[in-house]
Amino acid sequence: QPGDQIYIKDGQYKDMQLKWTGKGTEKASIKIEALNPGKVKIEGGSTLRIAGEWMSVSGLHFTDGYAPKGSVVEFRNGQELANHCRLTNCVIDGFNPSRRDQAYSYILLYGRHNRVDHCSLTGKLNLGVTLIVILNDERCLENHHQIDHNYFGERPVYGSNGAETMRVGTSQQAYSSSNTVIENNLFERCSGEVEVISIKSSDNVIRNNILLECEGVVALRHGDRNTVNNNLFIGNGLRNTGGIRVVNAGHQIYDNTLVGLAGTRFFSALGVMDAVPNSLPNRYCQVVD
């Protein structure tokens, strides 16, 4: 019910398929919290599904496990999506399957007006983007999600595409507005592939983030009118540390600081891509405006 606050006692919870749905309100959200943050361990073959309105989940620690089906955390339960929901103060650490080529994400964001904040997402070794903003449903467009104050920890080079740390949309949604804000996060040694943050939609904001020794770039890969400002890129001279790669039209890129980046070509500090004549949305459209 609106205003309910549910506490989970300390302990190890194994092979849990958690499905939490509810209908809170802006003034009376439903809160599900660890009694002592970090001491509720979710282990084994476990997943979490959040759906409904004005739900908040905090203090969980996913460790020593894997997602047996789907991704670890999804902001939906079946066809019911989450709106105005929040995942905060949670940890997902080394939650990998036995096979590196088994693909899944740590977090899938569906719905609208959801927030992921003050979380630690580390130790991802398998194929699959760490966090994806899903746009393949009209109920997910113009979502105004907030992804802020998180720690994205070390992710080693995977060796192929599909190992981004974050992706917003796909080429099919290039000209759809996502309106996602990615701000005040720390990305440390997120080197799964060349695109650390892959923007494949329009009207997003990436600001006030730190990318520390990441072998990759913030890629405005598809879509228009994205803003990248006041970010700090620190490479410390390490191979393939990069900055910002630009494709498409109408972007605003300003007040970023790029220090000690050693990447070249697709890993450059600033790459403005050549266009493909009469390009399809999933290729390389001209950089203009």
What is each model feature region?
Residues 2-41, 48-59, 80-85:
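Beta-solenoid repeat scaffold
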Residues 17-18, 44-49, 63-85, 93-289:
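Glycine- and acidic/polar-rich repeat regions and solenoidal domains
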